[in-house]
């Protein structure tokens, strides 16, 4: 992602969704270009705001843990081997052409799986992005509690029940209902996610720096 800014990531994601429709959720790592600035509390970045504006739930994986991004990392590895390392590219245009061919071939190989996936709605023709609009919808963060059962999230520390230490939690930030719900999460049984805690949460109303 060297050379990719939050603005260009936003534009590329929007271009992809215009072409292929809107997913129900989009999974990201915790890079500031996707999540927003880490040095300030209650920060929701450009890409997060785009997702919320279009009704897509952004999901941020557990920091510094492997496995959650395995599918995309595998895809990236194949692209590196099949496109980047295999050819000498005279210029950016050549690279983009070869990359587009690879992506198209990958979609053809996955056509059956894509056909089974839920249908993606198109972006509404009257949709207008407003990065200053009040935030609404859900943002999900996957996190791991520390030795005291605490979770660090959005620049705050939340105490989850003490019995759930060093364990995975799904933190569901409900910007519409103004609360955060914490659910236990087990890799062995991902369908079993009992509610551990609900806390009030309201995003401070500040101007987003565009």
Describe the residue ranges of each PLM region.
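Mobile-element integrase/transposase regions
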Residues: 7-13, 19-20, 52-53, 139-150
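Charged alpha-helix within mobile-element recombinases
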Residues: 40, 47-129, 134, 175
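Short Gly/charged-rich anion-binding patches and loops
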Residues: 12, 45-46
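Short, glycine/acidic-rich beta->alpha junctions
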Residues: 5-9, 42-43, 163
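Acidic/histidine-rich, metal-coordinating catalytic segments
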Residues: 4, 17-40, 62-64, 69, ...
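Short, well-ordered coil/turn segments that N-cap beta-strands
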Residues: 22-24, 56, 152
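Active-site beta-loop-alpha junctions of metal-dependent nucleic acid enzymes
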Residues: 1-25, 200-204
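C-terminal, beta-rich DNA-binding module of retroviral/retroelements integrases
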Residues: 103-210
């Amino acid at each position: 992602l060297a050379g990719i800014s939050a603005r260009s990531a936003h534009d590329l994601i929007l271009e992809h969704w215009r072409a292929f429709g809107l997913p129900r959720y989009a999974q990201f790592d915790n890079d500031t270009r996707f999540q927003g600035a880490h040095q300030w509390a209650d920060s929701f970045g450009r890409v997060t705001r785009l997702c919320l504006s279009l009704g897509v739930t952004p999901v941020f994986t557990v920091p510094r843990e492997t496995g959650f991004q395995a599918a995309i990392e595998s895809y990236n590895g194949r692209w590196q081997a099949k496109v980047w390392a295999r050819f000498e590219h005279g210029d950016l245009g050549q690279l983009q052409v070869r990359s587009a061919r690879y992506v198209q071939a990958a979609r053809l190989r996955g056509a059956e799986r894509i056909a089974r996936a839920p249908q993606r709605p198109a972006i509404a023709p009257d949709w207008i992005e407003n990065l200053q609009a009040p935030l609404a919808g859900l943002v999900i963060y996957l996190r791991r509690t520390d030795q005291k059962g605490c979770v660090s999230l959005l620049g705050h520390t939340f105490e989850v029940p003490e019995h759930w230490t060093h364990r995975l939690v799904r933190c569901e930030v409900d910007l519409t209902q103004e609360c955060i719900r914490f659910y236990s999460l087990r890799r062995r049984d991902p369908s079993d996610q009992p509610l551990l805690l609900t806390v009030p949460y309201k995003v401070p109303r500040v101007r987003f720096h565009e």
